[in-house]
Amino acid sequence: MFLKAVVLTVALVAITGTQAEVTSDQVANVMWDYFTQLSNNAKEAVEQLQKTDVTQQLNTLFQDKLGNINTYADDLQNKLVPFAVQLSGHLTKETERVREEIQKELEDLRANMMPHANKVSQMFGDNVQKLQEHLRPYATDLQAQINAQTQDMKRQLTPYIQRMQTTIQDNVENLQSSMVPFANELKEKFNQNMEGLKGQLTPRANELKATIDQNLEDLRSRLAPLAEGVQEKLNHQMEGLAFQMKKNAEELQTKVSTNIDQLQKNLAPLVEDVQSKLKGNTEGLQKSLEDLNKQLDQQVEVFRRAVEPLGDKFNMALVQQMEKFRQQLGSDSGDVESHLSFLEKNLREKVSSFMSTLQKKGSPDQPLALPLPEQVQEQVQEQVQPKPLES
């Protein structure tokens, strides 16, 4: 199955560590993305994927990602392959069972909530309003910081570019030695500003998650008296909602970080090019400075437009998730895919636990001791054993 190739490639890149650092969340992302892709594909497409020559694809992907596969990667593959295959198979088998149990939970909750529909709707309305009040300042602050940080970066870098251009025009003697300090300071200021962007703009995911937890706990405590006899089911559904909402906080942090990395990736070569042109003719250096000056404005604007709306989009996504949950408690029209968040939550917990176990047992400098086949099977069985939903 093609899923196996992709999952194992990313996981191997993760734990070898010397070529790239990938977290258990990223490994779980790959597994979940391909699980949903297979679930959504037509039957013929799934069958075609299952017939794919995994061995050849796996070897190709390993070469692309890791170069020469080392002994540690080989050892890791032998442990991770059975787990990934078993877990993906378990996930597929569990889908229908979890779907039925989640639908039953919602039906029981609806039976309790429907007589109090107006009160429940008011509780959700009040809760959403409080959530927006807590999150709106973050979106406003994010936009303000973007403008301040990017303007400050341009204000610090532009004078160095202009000084170097002026030095070229004045035909200063010993041009190269005169320009080196400016070029070095330009690079240093650029690096400092990029680190400043990362420190100031990367969302405080843990703080956002704490806000979500507090908001949902307030809602749960208000709904609890209306869920007499089914409070455990209410708690379970609230856990699923919390997982979805906190996942948005993590995605927000990833999007901001990705955009900062992209800005650095676009501008860093231009800064390096200025330094490399110091040993050449003045025409090449002048063009390099012009390119940097032009791209600095353009790339900062692209970055600003990409990141500024993220705070508001995050807030809107949380409100939509709250509204969807309210609808699920009021009718049976919104719970078609509500089981998926529970499947994903379960998958991420199991991948995190398994990866943590592997990392404790080995390192790139000390290869993992390969288990016997029956030990692998036992470990996989323990990891993928489903947790029964509380009734």
Curated annotation (Swiss-Prot):
Sequence repeats: 33-54, 60-81, 82-103, 115-136, 137-158, 159-180, 181-202, 203-224, 225-246, 247-268, 269-286, 287-308, 309-330
Pfam families: Apolipoprotein
Coiled coil: none
Region (Disordered): 354-391
Any one GO CC term of the record: extracellular space
Superkingdom, natural source: Eukaryota
GO molecular function: antioxidant activity; cholesterol transfer activity; copper ion binding; identical protein binding; lipid binding; phosphatidylcholine binding; phosphatidylcholine-sterol O-acyltransferase activator activity; phospholipid binding
UniProt KW Metal-binding keyword: no
Segments for region (13 X 22 AA approximate tandem repeats): 33-330
Tissue distribution of the protein: Secreted in plasma.
Phosphoserine PTM sites in chain numbering: S333
Keyword Secreted tagged: yes
Keyword entries, A-Z: Chylomicron, HDL, Lipid transport, Phosphoprotein, Repeat, Secreted, Signal, Transport
UniProt signal peptide: 1-20
Family the UniProt entry places it in: Belongs to the apolipoprotein A1/A4/E family.
Assembly behavior: Homodimer.
Task performed by this protein: May have a role in chylomicrons and VLDL secretion and catabolism. Required for efficient activation of lipoprotein lipase by ApoC-II; potent activator of LCAT. Apoa-IV is a major component of HDL and chylomicrons.
Domains: entry comment: Nine of the thirteen 22-amino acid tandem repeats (each 22-mer is actually a tandem array of two, A and B, related 11-mers) occurring in this sequence are predicted to be highly alpha-helical, and many of these helices are amphipathic. They may therefore serve as lipid-binding domains with lecithin:cholesterol acyltransferase (LCAT) activating abilities.
Protein name (record): Apolipoprotein A-IV
Organism of origin: Rattus norvegicus (Rat)
Upper classification of the organism: Eukaryota, Metazoa, Chordata, Craniata, Vertebrata
